[in-house]
Design a protein with these regions (language model features):
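C-terminal helical subdomain
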Residues: 90, 190, 214, 237-278, ...
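Polar helix-capping/helix-linker motif
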Residues: 86, 174, 260, 282-285
Length: 312
C-alpha cells in the first residue's frame, strides 16, 4: 500500500502536504492554470499556489463556481469559466487568455469526474472520457502558444489506469461507451488516456525546455461514508484513515510536479507520493499513445463542429 511505502529519495512521501512541498519555493511572477479549481484537490492547489505568490488562473465549470474560489486565493487570482465537456466553453476560455496575452508557466489538468453509475454521453462520447481526457487535450493544445520556454504541464492521472482500465488498454472502437459500459473501467480508461496524453506530449516537446508529466494524487478522503450505519461507519472510517489521503496530502504531488526545482527539465514521467513510479504496460505503450493522440484530434475536430462522434 502507498501509505506504508518508504519515504522517497527526495525525502517526500505519502504524508507530505502541498504546503510542505512548496515551503522553500517562491512562485512570485509565476502564472499557473488549474482546472477543476473550485473544490477538492483543485481548491487546495489554488490555495497553496496563491500562498506562495503565484498568479493562479482558476477554471471551473461555471463562472459562479470559479468566483467562489476568491476567498482562499491571493489578489492576483483570475477566475475563468471552462466546461471541459463543451468545446465552445473551452474555446471561449482559451481565447480570453490569448487576447489578454497571458504567459503561462504551468498548467495543472486537475478536473475530472468519476465512475458515473449510468452511461452518460455528450457529442456521442462517453462523458468521463470526454471530460477527463478530450477536454484537457483541447485546452492544452489551444494554450500551447502561451506557454513560457520552461513551462510545465501536469496531467492528473490515477492508479486507476492500472486497476480499472480495460485489459486491452484504450478501446478505440468504443469511445461512445455503448459496448458493455462499466463505470469503473470507463474511468480507468480516461485515466490511462491522461497518462498516455502526458507521455506523447512529452515526446512532442522533446528538444524544448517545456515538460509534461502525469501524477497519481492518491485515494482522497471524502464524505462518502456519511450515509453508513454507525457500526459500519466506524469501521470504514478506521480503514479510510489508514489508506486514504486528505486533500492537503493529495494536492502535494501535482504541485511538486508543477513547481519543484528538483525536477526542472524532467519530462515524460509518472509521479506518486512526489516520487517517480512505474506505470502499467499500457501506460508505457508509445504506439497506443500516438494512436490516442490521432483519435483525440479527430474527436476534437468533430465535436468542435457540433457534430456527434461515431465509433469507428
Amino acid at each position: 500500500m502507498d501509505r506504508f511505502a518508504k519515504i522517497g529519495p527526495n525525502g517526500l512521501g505519502f504524508h507530505t502536504t502541498a504546503e510542505e512541498v512548496t515551503r522553500s519555493i517562491d512562485l512570485t511572477d509565476k502564472t499557473i492554470v488549474v482546472t477543476g479549481a473550485n473544490s477538492g484537490l483543485g481548491l487546495e492547489t489554488v490555495r497553496v499556489l496563491s500562498l506562495r505568490g503565484a498568479k493562479v488562473i482558476g477554471m471551473a465549470r461555471t463562472i459562479e463556481k470559479a468566483n467562489s474560489i476568491k476567498p482562499i486565493a491571493n489578489a492576483l487570482f483570475m477566475p475563468l469559466e471552462c466546461d471541459l465537456s463543451e468545446p465552445s466553453s473551452i474555446m471561449r476560455c482559451t481565447q480570453t487568455l490569448i487576447k489578454s496575452g497571458t504567459q503561462i508557466d504551468s498548467i495543472i489538468c486537475n478536473a475530472g469526474i468519476m465512475a458515473l453509475p449510468q452511461l452518460q454521453q455528450k457529442y456521442g462520447v462517453e462523458l468521463q472520457f470526454l471530460t477527463n481526457h478530450i477536454g484537457h487535450f483541447m485546452l492544452v493544445n489551444q494554450l500551447m502558444a502561451l506557454l513560457t520556454d520552461e513551462a510545465r504541464i501536469t496531467i492528473v492521472s490515477s492508479s486507476a489506469h492500472k486497476v480499472f482500465a480495460y485489459p486491452d488498454g484504450i478501446q478505440f472502437d468504443n469511445f461512445s461507451g455503448f459496448n458493455k459500459y462499466n463505470p469503473q473501467k470507463a474511468y480507468g480508461q480516461s485515466k490511462l488516456a491522461n497518462l498516455l496524453f502526458s507521455n506523447e506530449l512529452a515526446n512532442r516537446l522533446n528538444g524544448s525546455h517545456q515538460t509534461a508529466n502525469a501524477v497519481h494524487p492518491g485515494v482522497i478522503r471524502t464524505n462518502l461514508l456519511r450515509h453508513y450505519n454507525p457500526i459500519l461507519k466506524y469501521g470504514a472510517v478506521l480503514v479510510e484513515k489508514l489508506l486514504f489521503k486528505n486533500v492537503h496530502q493529495g494536492a502535494a504531488t501535482q504541485i511538486y510536479a508543477s513547481t519543484h526545482p528538483d525536477i526542472k527539465g524532467v519530462s515524460g514521467k509518472y509521479f506518486s507520493n512526489c516520487n517517480p513510479k512505474s506505470t502499467s504496460r499500457h501506460g508505457e505503450d508509445q504506439m497506443m499513445g500516438k494512436k490516442l493522440w490521432e483519435f483525440s484530434e479527430k474527436i476534437a475536430k468533430t465535436i468542435s463542429q457540433g457534430t456527434d462522434w461515431e465509433d469507428q
